[in-house]
């Protein structure tokens, strides 16, 4: 009689559910330990609650979008590609759609549908999901033999750590996986926030808080090298602490070592108009308001909350009449609108980041199996590993792919 291998998975997020279900399908007896009462808490908030579950691209393009340890992921992504992910969800009855930037979402636009699909997949595969908190690994002779939790002790032939990072602690990502990994002797690369809002000492940000800019162009410039480290077109938001929104979160992942006032944001408020056409547009607006104060001539050109900050930077008296604005003053205004700058002071705390940069050192993990090189039977998957990507579905794909690979290999007798 064949005895199935016992596998314990710590964490029922994207990586954990995929790892557990895969191990069960390969014949293992699987227990998934989750400290929250509901699985997939972090999946629920991804993509603004819509769940950007993958990026519909080839493997090389995918790796190019992983600035931290992308090469480590070749085996995992090749074994379970973005195309495989899409086919997987479609086969489970979850219809998907591909939007701008090859971002894949459920047709329903509901992240709960992704969570429910993964939960059902794990349960139907034979996984037992228990609500408990893992406190320590049980190690013996260089191998892991179980997990000691608050309520019970679970013995196993293999253990997969899928606890996530340290961002969004309300979802359960409180850094538990790093503690367990350190207990096993693993090195933890220092943790930093990634996909996180910027802080700014510019007082005008607070004046503009709540202002959402759409269809603007953004450049993040390193003042030391004078080069742009990021540029894009899209949406951003001013807040009481600085800047947030889709482009800002994406930009943050391109800055590995944030230093106060080293980086500056350059915002083109009118990217659809070149300098000449913008100047002509402003001329027309001033003609329509020729006898009015210049401060009252921007209602058609700019959102209300940014008018005063622009006027202050321009330096022209607010009560100067439009018909007395000089060509030089008009050109100076165009320059401000084409390059509205905001100094960047730093990142918001890691607890507010979408993902955690840093984690278990990849050189201590076998990339072909996700097994620890230090402790036999110990595996890692998902955000706990020191791999993070740009926004656009890449980070969830890392979770699916590493979870799949870890689950498969953990089940082998």
Predicted regions: what they are:
Residues 130-143:
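A conserved short coil-to-beta-strand element within the FAD-binding core of flavoproteins
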Residues 3-5, 149-158, 231-232:
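Core beta-strand elements of the Rossmann-like FAD/NAD(P) dinucleotide-binding domain
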Residues 50-98:
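Glycine-rich active-site loop/strand segments that organize a redox cofactor
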Residues 5-32, 406-411:
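N-terminal Rossmann-like FAD-binding beta1-loop-alpha1 element of flavoenzymes
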Residues 130-133, 308-388:
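A glycine-rich dinucleotide-binding beta-alpha-beta segment and adjacent secondary-structure elements
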Residues 37-45, 59-60, 95, 187-190, ...:
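An anion/pyrophosphate-binding glycine-rich loop and adjacent beta-alpha core
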Residues 24-48:
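Glycine-rich FAD pyrophosphate-binding loop
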Residues 8-10, 33, 134, 154-169, ...:
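Short hydrophobic core segments
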């Amino acid at each position: 009689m064949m005895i199935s291998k016992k596998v314990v998975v710590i964490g029922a997020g994207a990586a954990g559910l995929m790892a557990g279900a895969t191990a069960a399908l390969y014949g293992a007896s699987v227990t998934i330990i989750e400290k929250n009462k509901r699985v997939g808490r972090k999946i629920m908030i991804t993509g603004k609650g819509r769940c950007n579950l993958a990026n519909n691209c080839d493997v090389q393009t995918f790796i190019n979008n992983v600035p931290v340890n992308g090469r480590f992921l070749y085996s995992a992504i090749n074994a379970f590609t973005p195309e495989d992910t899409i086919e997987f969800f479609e086969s489970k009855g979850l219809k998907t759609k591909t939007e701008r930037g090859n971002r894949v979402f459920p047709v329903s636009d509901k992240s709960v549908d992704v969570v429910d699909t993964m939960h059902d997949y794990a349960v139907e595969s034979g996984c037992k999901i228990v609500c408990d908190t893992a406190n320590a690994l049980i190690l013996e002779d260089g191998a892991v033999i179980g997990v000691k939790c608050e309520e019970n002790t679970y013995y196993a032939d293999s253990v997969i750590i899928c606890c996530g990072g340290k961002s969004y602690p309300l979802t359960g990502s409180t850094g538990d996986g790093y503690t367990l990994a350190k207990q096993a002797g693993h090195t933890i690369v220092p943790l930093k926030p990634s996909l996180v809002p910027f802080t700014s000492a510019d007082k005008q940000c607070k004046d503009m808080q709540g202002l959402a800019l759409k269809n603007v162009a953004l450049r993040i410039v390193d003042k030391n090298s004078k080069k742009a480290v990021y540029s894009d077109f899209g949406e951003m938001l001013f807040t009481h602490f600085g800047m947030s929104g889709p482009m800002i979160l994406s930009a943050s992942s391109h800055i590995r070592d944030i230093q106060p006032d080293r980086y500056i944001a350059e915002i083109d408020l009118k990217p659809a108009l070149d300098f000449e056409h913008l100047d002509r547009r402003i001329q027309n607006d001033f003609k329509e308001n020729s006898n009015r104060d210049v401060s009252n001539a921007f209602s058609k050109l700019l959102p209300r909350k940014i008018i005063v900050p622009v006027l202050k930077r321009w330096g022209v008296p607010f009560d100067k009449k439009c018909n007395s604005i000089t060509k030089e003053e008009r050109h100076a205004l165009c320059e401000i609108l084409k390059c509205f700058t905001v100094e960047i002071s730093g990142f918001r705390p890691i607890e507010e980041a979408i993902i955690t940069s840093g984690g278990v050192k990849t050189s201590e993990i076998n990339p072909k199996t996700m097994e620890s090189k230090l402790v036999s039977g110990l595996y890692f998957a998902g955000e706990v590993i020191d791999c993070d990507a740009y926004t656009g579905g890449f980070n969830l794909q890392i979770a699916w792919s590493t979870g799949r690979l870890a689950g498969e290999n953990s089940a082998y007798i």
